Amino acid sequence: MIYDKIDTKLIKLGKTNKFSGEEEKSITSLYYEDESFEFSFKNKYVKITKIETNAYGKKFVTIKSKLYADIVEKVAKELDAVSPILSDGSFRATINDATSFSKDVGEYSFYACVSLYFPSIYKDTEKTTLQVYLKEVVVTKIIKNNLEVEFDKLSLAI
């Protein structure tokens, strides 16, 4: 696990595997100092609105953190990959069977310390894409109600 900063010179490409029957599509594994490429900020947490599912049935979260986005952008730039940073400064991280959660969060928003895993880059004829996964999620607080309401003090907003 790498903490707090990344030296892009230590990122190494592994074996490239082409998709069968698709010569122009491939996936290449990534390593950092010959180890799996995992990253986190020590003692920093992020707010995650909820776990979502994309059109392909894959679960993901959207993380809006300048600190993490800067690292993701730095890695993508080093690998000449398309930036995964969205227009609002957030990025998506995929959840898979290897992702560990310290608590079940259900459908709620939550605060958590997270580690990112960069397993590979995907290439096709148009672009190179950095794969970003959540590796570990230590939930610090589950937010069951985003809106705070004191029912005994309600009044009409005119």
UniProtKB/Swiss-Prot annotation:
Xref: Pfam families: DUF5482
Source superkingdom: Eukaryota
Alphabetic keyword roster: Plasmid
Functional description taken from the UniProt entry: The presence of the two linear plasmids, termed pGKL1 and pGKL2, in strains of Kluyveromyces lactis confers the killer phenotype to the host cell, by promoting the secretion of a toxin able to inhibit the growth of sensitive strains.
Full protein name: Uncharacterized killer plasmid pGKl-2 protein 5
Species per Swiss-Prot/TrEMBL record: Kluyveromyces lactis (strain ATCC 8585 / CBS 2359 / DSM 70799 / NBRC 1267 / NRRL Y-1140 / WM37) (Yeast)
